[in-house]
Amino acid sequence: ATTFETETRFDLVFSNAAIQWIPNHEELLTRLFNLLSENGTLAIQIPLFLDMPLGKIINKRANDDRWRAQTEGVLDLFTIHDVSFYYDILSKLFNSIEMWETNYMHVLNSHGSIMEMMSSTGLKPYLERLYSESDKNDFKEEVLKETIKAYPSQMNGKVLLPFKRLFFIGYK
């Protein structure tokens, strides 16, 4: 998205849980706007992972003395701003804007399922920086212990994981 060039203009440009990995959102949103046709629409969804209890648990563990040297700089990989940041950019570009936050309620079989799901998303950049498989397993175990406290099991043993998301749509 930061280097994509084309003369073609699109009626719809969308992103689902991707732009948090790309820096410079003001420049990025302007580039995406410029890809739109005269009456085009930009639709973006951003996971607000760092605002969730699970994101806070992972960051707390990462800042622990044992892990800090290995996980230093991970937060720099995430580019997530507050709603007003995005509104101010979009309002300069678009005629009409819709914005909202919501929680996707994931119903998972266990707390281990949370760890499995997060190992390929928000937990992944932390795990990639750890030196050994043993460190990765220890880190995940520490996160799991706190996750169990933050997300209690339901009566049927399932675990509810509300996953916070920001959506915005800009209409040219």
What are these regions (language model features)?
Residues 26, 33, 39-110, 125-128, ...:
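Conserved catalytic/acceptor-binding region of the Class I
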Residues 1-2, 105:
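Adenine-nucleotide cofactor-binding loop residues
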Residues 2-13:
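A short acidic, Gly/Pro-enriched loop at the edge of an enzyme's catalytic core
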